[in-house]
């Protein structure tokens, strides 16, 4: 077996499959583009779904890739086991309707065992297969595998809902008896027992059926085009090749671990307790790549995942004695390890470090708050004479403040207490069940459409005309190819078309189909790309249409031009965002409609009013400069040399279209654009908002819509000016300031009157002093308009020696408000209000000297007042 670095293993994989006619598909962003079913790219095949379900036919049906992926459904096991990771690389080879079982198995065996390639000892390899899949069993024997190394497994069948499915065959590497202390042997494989001896290194999925949840598996129909989908974990392959005990002792992780040793002064013990080193090494990889791809820490979705990873890694740093931000210092090491195939981490190093360090500092503050919360729990339990921290409280410390249960146990131990581990585990299980139920999962790939896949006629899009004559080369009605259609809805393909098919964020053209006499025979209501790349026109048929006849295709030119203005404005906006916010503000999605444009981009905070103004100003300046818009078709490498911006998630062919706007913007784009920015006329941002952690959205309008937006604002201002009796609109701010000053004065006078009224009322209330067990107290219902007045009562009470304790209750609206104030240490206002609040179906809390509660049961107010004496 060859000794190879991780970079060499990855490259050897790609090189081997290239010799078998595969195209190398670049690794794409971890943040899915145009796929709402996925939280993260979680496998090598996730980016190829469009090929497997037949939505798009690839240029080359043979594909290979090395794809970064994230899975976070098992975070708690990372660091505890030898092979669990949150971020990993999947090596894959794929056949989209081309080769199948025989070639996939033969080539897999060649790559693994050939001296030219990985050169694994054949006797170390074992394969599992689906019991009914005799063809795979026989093929493994034909390539030279000993039958005793072939293990039937009932679970070796891959399917997720409706869509492509089929048996799979897995390849395992036997690391020997040293990793099988109980000498269980092949039962470990046959019974799927978790073990460190037989390491799964590759799974080959033979996608040959269209799964249908409504019927038994035996009744699944064969796919019109069978596929191969494989996945080999790079980390596992490298561990086997480098003879590492775990994935962490490879060149993918050890440089990070060595840096952690330097920062902590601790030494990584391969056979000892090294969990913290593993957690940090794994999590900083995920953080570096995900942030580099535009995801940012937050409170939901991807952001919550990243925040949880960072906090977990940070806590493990503290276990190693690192008590200051340190994770950001590991980013360069991650970048250097992966630089040969993933240069983006080093390219975005400064930005990634900034985000990680900022989040570490924020967590330090949160941790401080959590410690206060924990101390409050301990103090509360001591007062009640209890010694067990409830599972729900342990879980809150874990979930809200990032406290590992072990840290809470340490706090409890110092206080002579214990924690309710079972209650904590139950709360954790509930959260995991909720997460599984609501998780965004990669659903089925969808059923293949055989009719559309079989249409291979040529169809060309003409950018340069709004009307042309073309032959009708395909008609689809009721999901079948037909020779003619006379009514209803149909899908048409022409040899040439002037209609733009929806893609790249630009909506489709609408228009009409006319016959030779000029009669309208169909209206075009949508245009989409067919699997083989043709423009598929959805039409409402008004008169008979026949195959191979010439028709005139006429788009709605006014509609197209409005869309073009918005699309070109989108490019200007993208460039302005880079200039004003920074290069990290890259496109995360766009929509160029008729009446507006929508642009999503990565940014870690709300865009300020000043920044929005500058962005809008810069876009308009470029419009008024009347910059020429040019398009050129070239190869992808030349385009990149020109400096054209390529977008994550977009699939580019060998030939690409480059759109330049003066010397201001240059992007790869297949859409339609105006010839000169002056055609846009005017640009106005109408809304900026967050749509997820680290992603912002701008809605904007151009041309007539922009003018109307300004007119609407002007009309509103004029109406306000009239209401304020301001002679001119520009005087509105001054008038508003005057009103605000009047309001402040009235509020001040009102507060003074309330204070006087409260003082007068307090004179009577404060006379009603009772005493029990040596404590003087006042408990009374008062009539006030808001809870703030209760505090005014309390402030007056504090100034004189009326009593030791004050309890005030007020019915405000349909609610009940309670205030408890104390002047002595042995009467804790916060604890007392917690005991009283349930009487009025409420709850509350606060400090030892003052606390408040709210409830809803007004008939129980007197009962609450009567209960005070019993609490003293």
From Swiss-Prot:
Cofactor note: Binds 1 zinc ion per subunit.
Entry keyword annotation includes tRNA processing: no
Pfam families: DHHA1 (PF02272), tRNA-synt_2c (PF01411), tRNA_SAD (PF07973)
Keywords linked to the UniProt accession: Aminoacyl-tRNA synthetase, ATP-binding, Cytoplasm, Ligase, Metal-binding, Nucleotide-binding, Protein biosynthesis, RNA-binding, tRNA-binding, Zinc
Catalytic activity: tRNA(Ala) + L-alanine + ATP = L-alanyl-tRNA(Ala) + AMP + diphosphate
Known cofactor(s): Zn(2+)
Major subcellular site: cytoplasm
GO-annotated biological processes: alanyl-tRNA aminoacylation
SUPFAM superfamilies given in the database record: Class II aaRS and biotin synthetases, Putative anticodon-binding domain of alanyl-tRNA synthetase (AlaRS), ThrRS/AlaRS common domain, Translation proteins
PANTHER family: ALANINE--TRNA LIGASE, CYTOPLASMIC, ALANYL-TRNA SYNTHETASE
Family indicated by similarity: Belongs to the class-II aminoacyl-tRNA synthetase family.
The protein's name: Alanine--tRNA ligase
Biological classification of the source: Bacteria, Bacillati, Bacillota, Bacilli, Lactobacillales
């Amino acid at each position: 077996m060859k000794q190879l670095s991780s970079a060499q293993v990855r490259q050897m994989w790609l090189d081997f499959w290239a010799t078998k006619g595969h195209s190398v598909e670049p690794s794409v962003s971890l943040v899915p583009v145009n796929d709402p079913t996925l939280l993260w790219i979680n496998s090598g095949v996730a980016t190829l779904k469009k090929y497997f379900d037949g939505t798009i036919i690839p240029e080359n049906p043979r594909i290979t890739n090395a794809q970064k992926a994230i899975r976070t459904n098992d975070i708690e096991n990372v660091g505890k086991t030898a092979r669990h990771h949150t971020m990993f690389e999947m090596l894959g080879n794929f056949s989209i309707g081309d080769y199948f079982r025989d070639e996939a198995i033969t080539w897999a065996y060649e790559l693994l065992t050939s001296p030219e390639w990985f050169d694994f000892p054949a006797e170390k390899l074992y394969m599992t297969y689906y019991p009914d899949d005799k063809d795979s069993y026989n093929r493994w024997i034909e390539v030279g595998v000993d039958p005793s190394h072939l293990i039937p497994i009932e679970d070796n069948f891959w399917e997720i809902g409706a869509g492509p499915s089929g048996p799979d065959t897995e390849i395992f590497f036997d690391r020997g008896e040293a990793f099988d202390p109980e000498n269980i042997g092949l039962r470990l494989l046959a019974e799927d027992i978790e073990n460190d001896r037989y390491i799964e290194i590759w799974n080959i999925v033979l996608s040959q059926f269209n799964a249908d949840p409504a019927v038994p598996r035996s009744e699944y129909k064969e796919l019109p085009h069978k596929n191969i989908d494989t996945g080999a974990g790079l980390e596992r392959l490298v561990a086997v090749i480098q003879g590492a005990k775990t994935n962490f002792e490879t060149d993918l992780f050890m440089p990070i671990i060595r840096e952690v040793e330097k920062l902590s002064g601790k030494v990584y013990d391969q056979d000892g307790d090294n969990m913290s080193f593993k957690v940090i090494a794994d999590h900083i990889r995920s953080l570096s790549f995900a942030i580099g791809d535009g995801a940012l820490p937050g409170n939901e979705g991807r952001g919550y995942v990243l925040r949880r990873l960072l906090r977990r890694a940070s806590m493990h740093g503290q276990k190693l004695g690192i008590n200051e931000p340190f994770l950001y210092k590991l980013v360069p090491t991650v970048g250097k390890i992966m630089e040969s195939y993933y240069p983006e981490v080093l390219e975005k190093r400064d930005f990634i470090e900034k985000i990680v360090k900022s989040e570490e500092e924020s967590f330090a503050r949160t941790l401080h708050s959590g410690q206060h919360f924990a101390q409050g729990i301990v103090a509360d339990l001591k007062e009640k004479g209890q010694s067990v921290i409830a599972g729900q409280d342990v879980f809150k410390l874990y979930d809200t403040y990032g406290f590992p249960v072990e840290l809470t146990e340490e706090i409890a131990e110092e206080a002579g207490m214990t924690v309710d581990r079972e209650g904590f585990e139950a709360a954790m299980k509930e959260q995991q069940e909720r997460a599984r139920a609501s998780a965004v999962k990669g659903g089925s790939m969808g059923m293949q459409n055989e009719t559309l896949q079989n249409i291979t006629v040529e169809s060309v899009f003409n950018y340069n005309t709004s009307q042309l004559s073309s032959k009708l080369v395909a008609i689809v009605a009721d999901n079948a190819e037909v020779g003619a259609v006379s009514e209803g809805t149909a899908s048409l393909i022409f040899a040439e078309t002037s209609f733009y098919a929806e893609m790249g964020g630009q909506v489709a053209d609408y228009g009409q189909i006319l016959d030779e006499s000029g009669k309208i025979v169909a209206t075009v209501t949508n245009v989409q790309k067919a699997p083989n790349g043709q423009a598929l026109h959805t039409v409402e048929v008004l008169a008979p249409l026949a195959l191979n006849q010439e028709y005139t295709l006429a788009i709605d030119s006014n509609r197209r031009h409005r869309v073009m203005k918005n699309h070109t404005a989108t490019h200007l906006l993208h460039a302005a965002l880079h200039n004003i916010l920074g290069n990290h503000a890259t496109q995360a999605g766009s929509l160029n409609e008729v009446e507006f444009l929508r642009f999503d981009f990565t940014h870690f905070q709300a865009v300020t009013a000043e920044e929005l103004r500058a962005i809008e100003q810069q876009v308009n300046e470029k419009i008024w400069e009347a910059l020429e818009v040019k398009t050129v078709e070239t190869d992808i490498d030349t385009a990149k040399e020109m400096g054209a911006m390529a977008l994550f998630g977009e699939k580019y062919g060998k030939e690409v279209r480059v759109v330049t706007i003066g010397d201001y913007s240059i992007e790869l784009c297949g859409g339609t654009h105006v010839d000169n920015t002056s055609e846009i006329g005017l640009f106005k941002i109408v809304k900026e908002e967050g749509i997820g952690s680290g992603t912002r959205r701008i809605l904007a309008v151009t041309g007539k819509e922009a003018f109307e937006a300004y007119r609407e604002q002007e009309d509103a201002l004029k109406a306000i000016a009239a209401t304020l009796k301001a002679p001119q609109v520009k005087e509105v701010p001054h008038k508003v300031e005057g009103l605000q000053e009047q309001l402040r004065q009235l509020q001040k006078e009102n507060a003074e009157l309330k204070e006087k009224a409260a003082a007068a009322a307090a004179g009577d209330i404060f006379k009603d002093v009772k005493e029990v067990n040596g404590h003087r107290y006042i408990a009374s219902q008062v009539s006030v308009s808001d809870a703030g007045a209760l505090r005014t009562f309390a402030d007056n009470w504090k100034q004189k020696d009326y009593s030791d304790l004050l309890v005030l209750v007020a019915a405000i609206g349909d609610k009940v408000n309670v205030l408890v104030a104390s002047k002595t240490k042995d009467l804790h206002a916060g604890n007392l209000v917690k005991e009283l609040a349930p009487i009025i179906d409420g709850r509350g809390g606060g400090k030892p000297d003052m606390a408040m509660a709210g409830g809803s049961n007004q008939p129980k107010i007197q009962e609450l007042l009567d209960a005070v004496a019993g609490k003293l």
